[in-house]
């Protein structure tokens, strides 16, 4: 089986690793960590002949300009990659990549590759695209073997690309060109004259680069929004609604949550969206004209039972005697959590369907029908959708608004209205913040001076919706405040986002990057972000040479420095071997009578 060495080069973040992973695994990688250097292998059949294809991935950052060419000897074909939505990566082919290959590995065939074809035509990206015509013109200008436009995500043209690369590497024209290549010609030139063979035996072999290892995986903590909402319902804290039944215990709830979850209750309480039907009239509610409701009583109420400030009113709703308390409570639980609570198929599910249909809440009816039809595995997706919908509607109706507000936060001298029922149960810190400790402040909580308005608003939005505007805001500030409020899932979301920011900020270079990665490591250590800490430690260790030259490196404590030095990549023994190799090459150049001249 003939072995083919294929080396992939190009700017950082153009999709080189995704291209190789998608080709060798037939799947797009769900997570991507920038490559330092990596190798892949595939056995393929081309034109009825078997080939072992060695795929060499390289780092595009300028920090590795010295080490990258050590992957070039014995290469049979190069792929130079650019992203079709990054004109800078295309322009670097002529400015950087072609000259680098021409210098270190002349006469080796090159195939030009356009990546991320699936993004072509996405006008919302607002990035200048590179046309196929421009790419083909460059192929003709520089004498490349061809151009293929690909999408690793959609598997577009991947097989065509690597088939072309193998045919190019094994073509008679390519073999003839390689024989002219000198010391860095490919392994395919081993059939040249005996004098060439003896000369090539004296050429030093580059040291084998040890693997850098993969970056640690950052896990996102699973949302517990439904469990937190159930805890809020069961605690009955801050409730301003009481549903009463004939000779049965009442059910307590919260108007802000009921309105966020159900159009029926928005019409009952008079807080409708523009897409809703008109609100019910109070007279109709008290005269039995609204199905399932016998009467509604509204009483002024300044304080909750625990002495904290209330939403201003307490509403008592008498439920029609035809409605079973268990069925109605199941309905309320479903509004809060999106989870259908039942014992078995005989647990009054038909009655629950009837109630759901009478109030126009189709999702509860669907969940019950799924159980009766043996399709209960579909219900978690309904719950996830309802949790998201509740959060989004609560944001639209109530976020930072005075309507039904029962607490105010004072941040940087500005007052923010909030609703305790929508932020309760998220963490013990939050619960303590809005509880009895602040009775004397009349429902006002003043945050400390180190809390910024924008970061607090992001935290508050997360409390309402389980989503936070991390991309638009200060991700580090949100992480710090999220840790203070003990919102561990939010911290994990920030950790993942910041890790991606590190990748984006270092696509061109690491030493010259404007992002302070060492500062992020120190922040992660101080603010209980262990996943980000591990990621930063791995990144700094794996890019030790450029990172140690940054002035922030001196800020690291001795323990952290020792860990980084002990895990540095490339390791010291490899760098020493590189120095020895370079010395041997210099000796060979000086004694080879012009063999290294172009």
Curated annotation (Swiss-Prot):
Region described as Disordered: 175-210
Keywords annotated in UniProt: GTP-binding, Nucleotide-binding, Repeat
Positions of the BTB domain: 239-344, 405-472
Biased composition (Low complexity): 182-197
Pfam family, one: Ras
Residue positions binding GTP: 11-17, 57-61, 115-118
Similarity comment: family membership: In the N-terminal section; belongs to the small GTPase superfamily. Rho family.
Name of this protein: Rho-related protein racA
Species, as recorded: Dictyostelium discoideum (Social amoeba)
Phylogenetic lineage: Eukaryota, Amoebozoa, Evosea, Eumycetozoa, Dictyostelia
Gene: racA
């Amino acid at each position: 089986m003939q072995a083919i060495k294929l080396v992939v080069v190009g700017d950082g973040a153009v999709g080189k690793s995704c291209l190789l992973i998608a080709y060798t695994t037939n799947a797009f990688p769900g997570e991507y960590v920038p490559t330092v250097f990596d190798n892949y292998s595939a056995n393929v059949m081309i034109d009825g002949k078997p080939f072992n294809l060695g795929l060499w991935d390289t780092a595009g950052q300028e920090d590795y300009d010295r080490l990258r060419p050590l992957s070039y000897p014995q290469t049979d074909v190069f792929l130079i990659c650019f992203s079709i939505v990054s004109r800078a990566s295309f322009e670097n082919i002529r400015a950087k990549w072609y000259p680098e290959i021409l210098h270190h590995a002349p006469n080796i065939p090159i195939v030009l590759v356009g990546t991320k074809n699936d993004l072509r035509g996405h006008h919302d990206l607002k990035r200048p695209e590179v046309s196929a015509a421009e790419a083909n013109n460059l192929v003709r200008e520089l004498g490349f073997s061809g151009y293929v436009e690909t999408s690793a995500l959609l598997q577009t043209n991947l097989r065509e690309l690597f088939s072309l690369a193998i045919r190019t590497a094994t073509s008679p024209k390519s073999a003839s060109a390689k024989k002219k290549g000198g010391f860095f010609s490919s392994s395919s030139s081993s059939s040249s004259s005996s004098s060439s063979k003896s000369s090539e035996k004296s050429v030093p072999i580059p040291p084998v680069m040890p693997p850098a290892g993969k970056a640690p995986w950052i896990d996102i903590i699973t949302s517990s929004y439904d469990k937190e909402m159930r805890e809020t319902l069961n605690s009955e804290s801050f409730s301003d609604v009481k549903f009463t039944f004939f000779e049965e215990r009442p059910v307590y709830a919260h108007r802000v949550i009921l309105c966020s979850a159900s159009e029926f209750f928005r019409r009952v309480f008079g807080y409708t969206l523009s897409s809703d039907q008109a609100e019910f009239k109070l007279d109709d509610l008290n005269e039995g004209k609204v199905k399932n409701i016998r009467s509604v009583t509204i009483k002024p109420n300044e304080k909750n039972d625990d002495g904290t400030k209330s939403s201003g009113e307490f509403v008592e709703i008498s439920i029609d005697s035809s409605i079973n308390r268990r069925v109605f409570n199941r309905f309320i639980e479903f509004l809060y959590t999106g989870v259908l609570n039942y014992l078995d198929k005989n647990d009054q599910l038909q009655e629950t369907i009837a109630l759901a249909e009478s109030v126009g809440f189709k999702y509860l009816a669907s969940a019950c029908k799924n159980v009766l039809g043996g399709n209960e595995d579909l219900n978690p997706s309904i719950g996830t959708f309802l949790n998201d919908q509740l959060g989004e509607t609560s944001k639209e109706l109530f976020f930072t608004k005075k309507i039904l507000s029962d607490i105010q936060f004072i941040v940087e001298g500005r007052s923010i209205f909030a609703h305790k029922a929508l932020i309760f149960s998220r963490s013990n810190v939050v619960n303590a913040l809005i509880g009895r400790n602040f009775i004397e402040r009349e429902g006002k909580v003043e945050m400390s001076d180190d809390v910024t308005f924008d970061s607090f608003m992001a935290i508050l939005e997360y409390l309402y919706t389980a989503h936070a505007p991390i991309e638009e805001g200060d991700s580090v500030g949100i992480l710090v405040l999220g840790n203070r409020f003990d919102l561990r899932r939010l911290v994990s979301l920030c950790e993942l986002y910041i890790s991606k920011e590190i990748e984006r900020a270092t696509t061109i270079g690491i030493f010259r990057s404007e992002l302070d990665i060492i500062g992020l490591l120190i922040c992660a250590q101080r603010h209980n972000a262990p996943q980000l800490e591990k990621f930063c430690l791995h990144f700094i260790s794996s890019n030790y040479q450029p990172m140690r030259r940054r002035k922030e490196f001196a800020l690291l404590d001795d323990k952290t420095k020792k860990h980084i030095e002990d895990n540095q990549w490339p390791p010291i023994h490899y760098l020493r071997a590189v120095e020895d190799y370079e010395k041997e090459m210099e000796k060979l150049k000086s004694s080879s009578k012009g063999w290294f001249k172009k």
